Amino acid sequence: MATKRRPLRPNLGGTAGSPSSSGSNMNFRPGGPDITRSEARGTRPTAAPTSIREILVMGVIHLCKKTIFFNTDLKVALYLGSLFVISVIGDFVPFPKTYFARSDNLFNQYFVKIGWGWTLLFVVPFLVLSAYTITCGDHKRMLRHHFPRIVIATFFWFFWTKLFNVVENSYGRCTTKGYATKSSCLKAGHLWKGFDISGHAFILIHSSLVLIEEARPIIRWETIKEHIRNERHNRSTAENSGTNPLRTLNEEQMRSLQFLYKRLTPIIRTLFIGMAALQLLWDIMLVGTMLYYHRMIEKVISGIIAILTWYFTYRFWYPTPGLLPEAPGNGSFSYQREIPTFPFKRPSHLSTGAATTSSGSNSSRTNLNGKAATTGVPRDQQIPTFMGMPLFTSPKAASAAANLLMSDQQKRERDREQQTLES
């Protein structure tokens, strides 16, 4: 005769001494599957499920990163090479006239002529919000260490464009005698011929390079969320992590970072998408400038000046330790550094007898199709794994296992030598 089934989850709120409150009568581990995440101990929290909207946004962000973070050194070389080659061809073989050849085209009138204003429209809020977040709400550090970059970039834009006008006015002449200045010559309906260094080419290249450099804080921005989650777990369980970049932050900084990251990340992502689209537009308009405006030497000189300005500021000045302002992405913690998932190598004496028989420095594994897959890592430096996960979670455990294997191997060798001598 069938008996009554025991409940899968007895009443834990029973009185002391009742069968339901006795640990010996439980057929499961206390806590059960419905234990809350905040009550769990000993395991790292997992990421929350990702929504479809989040996946689509991250896909757009990924495409924008591919566009704007194209190899900068190669892009600079392409700028100079294109300015020279395309401009030389255009000087000798006129290109067919298109809509972009008209100086009153929509893009030239409403974008290029006020190009620096469009650049500041996206760069300033992006810089302020991203720097304010990675400095954990320290507005003084943001204003002192990051905002001056925009002031410096604006100063160089103003200085060089004004200098170009001075050069043109000083070394030019009117097609009709009697007019000493460019303004009076043009006002009378005549032409002013001078050395007109291309302000359009300078503004487009200068704006593009500033957009690229100031957008760099978005690199690995998503990892901040993971760092916050793991650091909260470490602090709740009194664990010490030697790799989490947030471990040096105090509790107030952690709260500020968590709040600002959650509130400002959607705005920062939107601004970044706008910056990537604007930088792509500047590249397209630069091609139009190469094809239809100015002479080759005027465009090449302006391009060289824009690139030298970028190199002096973003490659020499800002990365230099001790000088202000700081480079984009610097803050109260470093989140753009690659953190090794397994920070130590397997000792060479962990290799087994099978490892010594492998040929070459590359070891082979068997993939799901039964074929040998080359790992590219020497066998004696591979980390022991089980089902793809490392067997050891700390250097101490790895060293203990290594010593155990080494002593066991030495014992077997001594036994073999003893058997050889006896025979």
Swiss-Prot record:
Keywords: Endoplasmic reticulum, Hydrolase, Lipid metabolism, Membrane, Transmembrane, Transmembrane helix. InterPro entries: FIT (IPR019388), FITM1/2 (IPR046401). Residues 1-75, 135-146, 213-270, 321-423 are cytoplasmic. The active site is at 200, 294. Coiled coil: none annotated. Fatty acyl-coenzyme A (CoA) diphosphatase that hydrolyzes fatty acyl-CoA to yield acyl-4'-phosphopantetheine and adenosine 3',5'-bisphosphate. Preferentially hydrolyzes unsaturated long-chain acyl-CoA substrates in the endoplasmic reticulum (ER) lumen. This catalytic activity is required for maintaining ER structure and for lipid droplets (LDs) biogenesis, which are lipid storage organelles involved in maintaining lipid and energy homeostasis. May directly bind to diacylglycerol (DAGs) and triacylglycerol, which is also important for LD biogenesis. It comes from the Eukaryota. Pfam families: FIT (PF10261). GO terms for cellular component: endoplasmic reticulum membrane. Disruption phenotype: RNAi-mediated knockdown results in loss of auditory sensitivity. In the whole body or specifically in muscle cells or fat body, results in locomotor impairment, uncontrolled and uncoordinated wing movements leading to flightless phenotype. In nociceptive dorsal class IV dendritic arborization C (ddaC) neurons results in altered branching and dendritic field coverage in third instar larvae. In fat body reduces lipid droplet size with aging. In all neurons does not show any of the phenotypes above. This is Acyl-coenzyme A diphosphatase FITM2. It comes from Drosophila melanogaster (Fruit fly). Its EC number is 3.6.1.-. The chain crosses the membrane at residues 76-96, 114-134, 147-167, 192-212, 271-291, 300-320. It catalyses: an acyl-CoA + H2O = an acyl-4'-phosphopantetheine + adenosine 3',5'-bisphosphate + 2 H(+). GO terms for biological process: adult locomotory behavior; fatty-acyl-CoA catabolic process; lipid droplet formation; lipid droplet organization; lipid homeostasis; lipid storage; phospholipid biosynthetic process; regulation of dendrite development. It is found in: Endoplasmic reticulum membrane. Its main location: endoplasmic reticulum.
